[in-house]
Amino acid sequence: MNKKKYFSKIYDQFVDKIYRFIFLRVNSEEIAKDLTSETFTKVWHAFQNSEIKNLKAFLYKTARNLTTDFYREKAKISHASLENLPPIVDPKRNPQEKVIFEERMERIRKGLNNLREDYRQAIILRYIDGFSIKEISEIMERSPGAIRVLIHRALESLKRECNKKEDFSSS
């Protein structure tokens, strides 16, 4: 199989995943589409000119770097919202269980939005995108041990965020 056909298969396999990865960071469909396109363009050029050992990790690393560059250029920091993710609903649940489940999911979304960026990124890569520790270490450019610690701390922080009681009293 030639490089063009192989890369076309890689594109088809990862375009939606890379888009979601970027969208969760920029919270804009238009910007996410542009950065996704730019990611695949850069990876294609690198793919033509050199051997890439782990193409999946290289794709995510490139997407992460382009997202970081985007925020540097705009000189603003925006926390990506997870509220636009489609709800996860089990049709077998009764209405009361569905309400409780949705409330929990909303707490998790809010908790994730309140985490620092590297914690949020580690949790998303591990539990939403399904990456291994090794793959996350390549994407985030840290050792596997550091990633394990980061994920542990991120989960502890997320647990604290989700357990916070919302204050509805007026200040």
Where would I find each of the regions flagged by the language model?
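Arg/Lys-rich amphipathic alpha helix in sigma70-family domain 2
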Residues: 64-82, 101
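DNA-recognition helix of helix-turn-helix
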Residues: 138-164
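Hydrophobic-face residues of short alpha-helical interaction/recognition segments
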Residues: 18, 22, 59, 63-71
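Structural recognition of an alpha-helix C-terminal capping motif at a helix-to-coil junction
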Residues: 34-41, 45, 53-65
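Acidic, proline/glycine-rich intrinsically disordered inter-domain spacer in sigma factors
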Residues: 85-113
